[in-house]
């Protein structure tokens, strides 16, 4: 090889190496975002054949994809889900979690839907339940650490002040167990977000109905640790999913179009 050919070969080699280096810099390797989720809350999140499915799962996957990453779901009990996040056992929580002032003291939220709470009873409403006040002297199944549990506690204080019988609150670690208690006739009502209530009414062959109007609609959000840049990235990704129609498609798939964030 003469000197001219050698010089050209060197230049081409350096140029190729530069292109490879620039390409590597432009396309960083995708990372895995681990989401803690209480997979006992259909249609938001549940397990089918050992695999997590639901609206929240689809949303987590869509957000991760939007960020050039991938999502991993880690089943975690709702009563320990924020401690798990704070202990860095996951990067975020997506679990139909209501964005409340109390929770916002511990974590940041990227809101993605607005959901109210609902009471569910057996078909025919044998206990004549019409709202929280009508639960006096009756028993209600609810999942631990939920906003519904907190609302029942507040209602009991109101009933006590009025000299009325309190609600018997039966707390379950899994929401599916709370719903099963109503089906088995062990309680008069089940109290949860409107999303699982509607799901159970639609999928149980006429065994259940709602009782009274939805209560206290509020935003639900993805929780992240304070100071974690993921929180801001999630907000941007959620806005993008609404703008490009992805969120609309996901919510429609699970029968949840009515719970989209209002503009």
Predicted regions and their residues:
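Beta->alpha turn/N-cap motifs
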Residues: 36-41, 74-79, 88, 92-100, ...
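Periplasmic-binding protein-like
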Residues: 38-39, 114-121, 148-151, 194, 198, 238-255, ...
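A ligand-binding cleft/hinge motif common to bilobed small-molecule-binding domains
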Residues: 80, 97-105, 151-155, 184-216
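Extracytoplasmic small-molecule ligand-binding "clamshell" domains
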Residues: 29-96, 244, 253
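Short helices/loops that flank or line small-molecule/ion binding pockets
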Residues: 62-66, 74-75, 79-92, 106-107, ...
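Flexible hinge/capping segments at coil-to-helix
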Residues: 122-140
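Ligand-binding cleft/hinge of the Venus flytrap
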Residues: 60-68, 148-171, 202-205
């Amino acid at each position: 090889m003469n000197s001219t050919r050698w010089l050209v070969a060197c230049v081409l080699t350096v140029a190729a190496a530069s292109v490879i280096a620039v390409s590597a810099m432009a396309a960083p390797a995708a990372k895995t975002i681990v989401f803690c989720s209480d997979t006992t809350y259909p249609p938001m999140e549940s397990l089918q054949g050992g695999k997590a499915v639901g609206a929240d799962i689809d949303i987590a996957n869509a957000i991760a994809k939007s960020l050039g990453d991938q999502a991993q779901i880690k089943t975690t009990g709702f009563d320990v889900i924020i401690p798990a996040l704070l202990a860095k056992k996951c990067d975020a929580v997506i679990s139909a979690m209501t964005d409340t002032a109390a929770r916002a003291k511990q974590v940041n939220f990227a809101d993605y839907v607005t959901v109210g709470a609902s009471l569910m009873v057996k078909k025919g409403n044998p206990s004549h339940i019409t709202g929280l006040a009508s639960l006096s002297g009756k028993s209600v199944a609810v999942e631990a650490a939920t906003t519904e549990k907190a609302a029942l506690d507040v209602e009991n204080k109101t009933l006590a002040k009025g000299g009325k019988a309190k609600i018997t609150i039966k707390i379950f670690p899994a929401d599916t167990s709370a719903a099963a208690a109503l089906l088995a006739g062990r309680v008069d009502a089940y109290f949860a977000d409107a999303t699982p209530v509607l799901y159970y009414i639609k999928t149980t062959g006429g065994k259940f109905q709602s009782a009274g109007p939805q209560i206290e609609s509020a935003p639900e959000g993805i929780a992240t640790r304070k100071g974690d840049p993921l929180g801001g990235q999630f907000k941007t990704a959620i806005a993008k999913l609404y703008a490009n129609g992805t969120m609309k498609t996901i919510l429609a798939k699970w029968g949840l179009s009515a719970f989209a964030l209002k503009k």
